[in-house]
C-alpha cells in the first residue's frame, strides 16, 4: 500500500468504458483511485440526474474493485458560471452545484474540485467577480451542510493562477469546507515561486494535480494540456522535495486527456512510472 494515494483522471481512460470497467482498468494500471469528471457536456452533466439504482451500482463497483472515487472535477461551471451576467445561467450554476453535492454525498465523494473562474466565455469585470463571490459563498454553505469539501483548482487563467490569489478567497470565506487543489502544471506555467506557494497553502491543500505545462511568456500564451511529462517547465523533483519537507500527506492525481488516444493504457502506465521515478529521485516515497 502506498503512503500517498495516486489516482488517474477519468478523461485519461477510454470514454466508452462502463464504470466497473474503468475502475478495474485503473487498478490494473497501478492506480488507487479515479477522479470523476462532470464537465460542461450534456453527457457528463446527466450524471447529476442519475437514479438511485445507478448510484447504488457505482458504489457496489467501488467496493468490489477496491478502487474509489474520492474526488469530482466539476468543470461544468465553465459553461454555467456563478459570475455570469445572465440570471438564468447563475440559477443553473446553483442547480448544478446542489446536484453535484448530492451526487458526491451518495457516492462517497469527499472533495469536489471547482474551477477558479468567475466567468470563462464572457468578459471579466468587477460585476462578474462580485457575483462569483456571492455564488461561491452560497456553494460553500451548501457543501458544509453535507460535509463535502469544495476545493478550488489553481487555474490556467490569471483570475486564480496562484495559491496566493486563492488565499484571499479563503480569508473571505473562512470555512473548513473550502480548500485549495493545486495543479503544479498551472502553478509552474504562470511563473510562480512554486515551493513558496505550496508552503503558503500546505495546511489547506485537499489534493494535488500532476501534469506538465509550457510557460506563459511575453511571446507565448503557454500550453496547459497535452504536454508529455518531462517536456514542459515543471520541476517535479523540486516539487516533491518541497512536499517532503512540508510533510504533505495527501493524494496525487495524474491529469491526462488520453481518452481518445490510440494506446491510452500504455500512456498512463508510462506516466505513472515517470512520476514515481521523479518521486524516488526526490526522496519522496509514494
UniProtKB/Swiss-Prot annotation:
GO terms for molecular function: DNA binding; intramolecular oxidoreductase activity, interconverting aldoses and ketoses; L-ribulose-5-phosphate 3-epimerase activity; zinc ion binding. It holds the Pfam family AP_endonuc_2. Keywords: Carbohydrate metabolism, Isomerase. GO terms for biological process: DNA repair; L-ascorbic acid metabolic process; L-lyxose metabolic process. Disulfide bonds: none annotated. Belongs to the L-ribulose-5-phosphate 3-epimerase family. This is Putative L-ribulose-5-phosphate 3-epimerase SgbU. It comes from Escherichia coli (strain K12).
Amino acid at each position: 500500500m502506498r503512503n500517498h494515494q495516486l489516482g488517474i483522471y477519468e478523461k485519461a481512460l477510454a470514454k466508452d468504458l462502463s464504470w466497473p470497467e474503468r475502475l478495474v482498468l485503473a487498478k490494473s494500471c497501478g492506480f488507487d483511485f479515479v477522479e470523476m469528471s462532470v464537465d460542461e457536456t450534456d453527457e457528463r452533466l446527466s450524471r447529476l440526474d442519475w437514479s438511485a439504482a445507478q448510484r447504488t451500482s457505482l458504489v457496489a463497483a467501488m467496493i468490489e474493485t477496491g478502487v474509489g472515487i474520492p474526488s469530482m472535477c466539476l468543470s461544468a461551471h465553465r459553461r454555467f458560471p456563478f459570475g455570469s451576467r445572465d440570471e438564468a445561467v447563475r440559477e443553473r450554476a446553483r442547480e448544478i452545484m446542489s446536484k453535484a453535492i448530492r451526487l458526491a454525498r451518495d457516492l462517497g465523494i469527499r472533495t469536489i474540485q471547482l474551477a477558479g473562474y468567475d466567468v470563462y466565455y464572457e468578459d471579466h469585470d468587477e460585476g462578474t467577480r462580485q457575483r462569483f463571490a456571492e455564488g461561491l459563498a452560497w456553494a460553500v454553505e451548501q457543501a458544509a451542510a453535507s460535509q463535502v469539501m469544495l476545493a478550488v483548482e489553481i487555474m490556467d487563467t490569471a483570475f486564480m493562477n496562484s495559491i496566493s490569489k486563492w488565499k484571499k478567497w479563503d480569508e473571505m470565506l473562512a470555512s473548513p469546507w473550502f480548500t485549495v487543489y493545486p495543479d503544479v502544471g498551472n502553478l509552474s506555467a504562470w511563473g510562480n515561486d512554486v515551493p513558496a506557494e505550496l508552503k503558503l497553502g500546505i495546511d489547506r491543500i485537499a489534493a494535488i494535480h500532476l501534469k506538465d505545462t509550457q510557460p506563459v511568456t511575453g511571446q507565448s500564451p503557454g500550453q496547459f494540456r497535452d504536454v508529455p511529462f518531462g517536456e514542459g517547465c515543471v520541476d517535479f523533483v523540486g516539487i516533491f522535495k518541497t512536499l517532503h519537507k512540508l510533510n504533505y500527506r495527501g493524494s496525487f492525481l495524474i491529469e491526462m486527456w488520453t481518452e481518445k488516444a490510440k494506446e491510452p493504457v500504455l500512456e498512463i502506465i508510462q506516466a505513472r512510472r515517470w512520476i514515481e521515478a521523479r518521486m524516488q529521485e526526490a526522496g519522496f516515497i509514494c
